[in-house]
């Protein structure tokens, strides 16, 4: 889905039973982005519950990230463990601001070019524009 016309949000899932951190804000921002991109879909709490019913259990103490991506044809849902950040890493400063930063869009072609040569576990890109880290 990357590099298609669409939007995404990443929600932290924590605890047992699972809690979706800042759920309302994520839903609001995702729907606002979809409207700006002229994608005729709105993710409601009801649709969210239908999509994820029976996928979470109270037996697990969650520390995960739930990514929801939407374009004109597909709704993609991905749950992955939240990794602990490495305190020691090498940063590559890149003077770049993604297109339309007010929305979390799926157009990451330029950023992927910066990521290709990096060893992802030890090296990170740090985006900046006009002397501000983004």
Where are these regions (language model features)?
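Cysteine/selenocysteine-centered motifs that mediate thiol-based redox chemistry or coordinate metal-sulfur cofactors
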Residues: 35, 60-61
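Periplasmic polypeptide-binding modules associated with outer-membrane biogenesis and secretion
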Residues: 61-72
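Phosphate/pyrophosphate-binding loops at sites that engage ATP/ADP/AMP, CoA/4′-phosphopantetheine
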Residues: 54-60
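Helix-start/capping segments and mature chain N-termini
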Residues: 1-54, 71-134
